[in-house]
C-alpha cells in the first residue's frame, strides 16, 4: 500500500501471493537475514518487519515490530505494538501480544478464518483501486509556489 518502504538492499525480500503490506510499514533485511512473508498475510499500518520469516495466513498488527531471525508460524495473530525479539520462534496458530511478545493462547478455527478474510478484503481493495485509477494532469499555468 501507499507509503510502504521495502529495502531489499542487503538480502532479498519475498512477499507471498494475496499478502498486503499496509501504509507506513518498513520492511528491511540484514546480512544473513532475508525477509519472507508468506501467502495471505496482512501486515498492519506502521509495522516494522526486519530480516524475519512470517508464515502463511498471519496478521501482524499495527505498529508491531518483528526483528532479525524471528520465525512466526502459520495462522498467527501478532497484536498491535507487539515486539517479536531477535530469533524468537512463534508456533502455528498463536495469538501473541506485548513487548516482548508472548503467546497467550491458540487461535480457534473462527479466528483463523478471520485472518484469511482480512487478506482477501485487501485483495478486493487492490482490484477496486486499480480499476478506478485515473491520470491527473496539472493545468499548464500551475504554479506550486
Residue locations for each model-derived region?
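Glycine-rich hexapeptide-repeat left-handed beta-helix
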Residues: 9, 15-17, 23-25, 29-30, ...
Amino acid at each position: 500500500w501507499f507509503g510502504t518502504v521495502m529495502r531489499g538492499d542487503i538480502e532479498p525480500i519475498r512477499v507471498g501471493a494475496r499478502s498486503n503490506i499496509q501504509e507506513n510499514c518498513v520492511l528491511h533485511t540484514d546480512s544473513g537475514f532475508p525477509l519472507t512473508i508468506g501467502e495471505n498475510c496482512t501486515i498492519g499500518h506502521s509495522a516494522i518487519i526486519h530480516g524475519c520469516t512470517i508464515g502463511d495466513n498471519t496478521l501482524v498488527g499495527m505498529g508491531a515490530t518483528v526483528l532479525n531471525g524471528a520465525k512466526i508460524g502459520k495462522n498467527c495473530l501478532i497484536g498491535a505494538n507487539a515486539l517479536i525479539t531477535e530469533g524468537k520462534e512463534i508456533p502455528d496458530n498463536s495469538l501473541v501480544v506485548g513487548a516482548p511478545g508472548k503467546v497467550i493462547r491458540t487461535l480457534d478455527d473462527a479466528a483463523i478464518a478471520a485472518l484469511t478474510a482480512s487478506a482477501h478484503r485487501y485483495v478486493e481493495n487492490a482490484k477496486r483501486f486499480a480499476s478506478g485509477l485515473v491520470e491527473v494532469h496539472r493545468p499548464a499555468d500551475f504554479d506550486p509556489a
